[in-house]
Amino acid sequence: MLARVTRKMLRHAKCFQRLAIFGSVRALHKDNRTATPQNFSNYESMKQDFKLGIPEYFNFAKDVLDQWTDKEKAGKKPSNPAFWWINRNGEEMRWSFEELGSLSRKFANILSEACSLQRGDRVILILPRVPEWWLANVACLRTGTVLIPGTTQLTQKDILYRLQSSKANCIITNDVLAPAVDAVASKCENLHSKLIVSENSREGWGNLKELMKHASDSHTCVKTKHNEIMAIFFTSGTSGYPKMTAHTHSSFGLGLSVNGRFWLDLTPSDVMWNTSDTGWAKSAWSSVFSPWIQGACVFTHHLPRFEPTSILQTLSKYPITVFCSAPTVYRMLVQNDITSYKFKSLKHCVSAGEPITPDVTEKWRNKTGLDIYEGYGQTETVLICGNFKGMKIKPGSMGKPSPAFDVKIVDVNGNVLPPGQEGDIGIQVLPNRPFGLFTHYVDNPSKTASTLRGNFYITGDRGYMDKDGYFWFVARADDVILSSGYRIGPFEVENALNEHPSVAESAVVSSPDPIRGEVVKAFVVLNPDYKSHDQEQLIKEIQEHVKKTTAPYKYPRKVEFIQELPKTISGKTKRNELRKKEWKTI
């Protein structure tokens, strides 16, 4: 079904200086050019010139992917593949845009015929980084079915919650998770179709590999309005049960062009590798829409578990030009001897998900000669702020607002605050709601309404803007610590902690105190070399280090060493769980 092609290194194609923007997408780029560093040498002028027109009808598969197929056939695109997959066994697979189109149309016919799905039906997709995950994404676009990704780390309880809350009609997964689905399927009244990606058959499941052998690649893409729901993403659940975030064909299908063009700086000649788990919106950001709207190659490595040396070897062996990974990954990579690897093709590195500490970016730059361009966004949005090529990077800053959004710091009444004052990070949505923003939380109107304050969508994050227009993250609104009249964000304290050689990871929360009301408490995971040290002495050393690194009133008056931090399935620290533990006796 999925033909394996022989291994050989990609020939570097000369970068196109111009990118034709097809049909309904043309309004995205006023000058029809891909991003270049000089775009942001004059940030204000660039942002002012940015224009967007949203067409009434838009479907990413038809209006972008199929158009790249036409460019490819006409020889008007570099010879990069659309998709390049490898695994640890040395197997490789590459598809052109034409092959991607043919295979995804077969998959679309399976959804419509074998699964009896109709436009608007909901499809939960739980697969690791296998080629079928990308085909399923495009097949859902072609059929107008609503994609709902999930991570392979979900438990049986998690799967039940997602099936029931989303009212999913179909689930696509592998033989590892199929037993968990079968165990809860009888409790999910809307579920009527199950597809398995496996070499083996399973009772009650359609086998995708077998169905693909007989499916037709003749399929007419549905005509979707730009504001139809395209996908539902579950949030990571850092402050409670995961919410269902609805995105339209335009909010991600068009909105993520801002990411691809400006933040990722992609052209049709680029090979982009994003290491995000397939269950999260970040994979939609950087493994589907952002690279493909620019005609770039999506590269992926099916690593069953995180292996720093495998990542470094892959960056060295393959012609990857743009690399995107989480701050935790970069932190682990810089602990290795990077200088023994040569990244001959790599030219641009980005990170998102959580703030990246300045010490990590400095180590990466010293070892590779490359900056890490941090970006800030949410499941609910495309890129909100970013450090863009051609712009001065301020280490630790989220950068400046993306061209898509008017971002401000606002107070509790929705008034805009001046530079230097901490407040809530908001995106202006009135009088004109920007593209690239979710529509609502599914079946949760009260939560949707709570995100609006005056003319702004409130992100739930605290921050401030400096005099140069750069935004700085302080904390999730509910993570801020109030001690003796001071407002303390955990991120700056964690930054200071993580710079101490004994600290592998840390999380900072509030802890009750009879005099100050609450104080800063640090939960610290020690590096192996320090686990045998005298803990009382080590606590004093760490506290003194923080006092010297940041404002003394922010130092953790309480320190507890733990084996590991509690984290969400997406790898984000669950500070709320640590905070509840501290306050449970009050």
Curated annotation (Swiss-Prot):
Location of this chain's protein in the cell: Mitochondrion; Mitochondrion matrix
Record CDD domains: MACS_euk
Keyword set, alphabetical order: Acetylation, ATP-binding, Fatty acid metabolism, Ligase, Lipid metabolism, Magnesium, Metal-binding, Mitochondrion, Nucleotide-binding, Transit peptide
Keyword Glycoprotein applies: no
Reaction equations catalysed: a medium-chain fatty acid + ATP + CoA = a medium-chain fatty acyl-CoA + AMP + diphosphate; propanoate + ATP + CoA = propanoyl-CoA + AMP + diphosphate; butanoate + ATP + CoA = butanoyl-CoA + AMP + diphosphate; 2-methylpropanoate + ATP + CoA = 2-methylpropanoyl-CoA + AMP + diphosphate
Gene Ontology molecular function terms on file: 2-methylbutanoate-CoA ligase activity; ATP binding; fatty acid ligase activity; fatty-acyl-CoA synthase activity; medium-chain fatty acid-CoA ligase activity; metal ion binding; propionate CoA-transferase activity; propionate-CoA ligase activity
Modified sites of kind N6-acetyllysine: K157
Entry-linked Pfam families: AMP-binding, AMP-binding_C
Biological process according to GO: acyl-CoA metabolic process; cholesterol homeostasis; fatty acid biosynthetic process; regulation of blood pressure
Modified residues (N6-succinyllysine): K73, K106
Transit peptide: 1-27
A GO term from the CC aspect: mitochondrial matrix
Enzyme Commission number(s) from the entry: 6.2.1.2, 6.2.1.17
InterPro entries named in the record: AMP-bd_C (IPR025110), AMP-bd_C_sf (IPR045851), AMP-binding_CS (IPR020845), AMP-dep_synth/lig_dom (IPR000873), ANL_N_sf (IPR042099), Mitochondrial_ACSM (IPR051087)
Cofactor names: Mg(2+); Mn(2+)
Record-listed ATP binding positions: 235-243, 374-379, 461, 476, 572
Tree of life domain: Eukaryota
Annotated family: Belongs to the ATP-dependent AMP-binding enzyme family.
Function: Catalyzes the activation of fatty acids by CoA to produce an acyl-CoA, the first step in fatty acid metabolism. Capable of activating medium-chain fatty acids with a preference for isobutyrate among fatty acids with 2-6 carbon atoms.
Full protein name: Acyl-coenzyme A synthetase ACSM3, mitochondrial
Higher taxonomy: Eukaryota, Metazoa, Chordata, Craniata, Vertebrata
Gene name as annotated: ACSM3
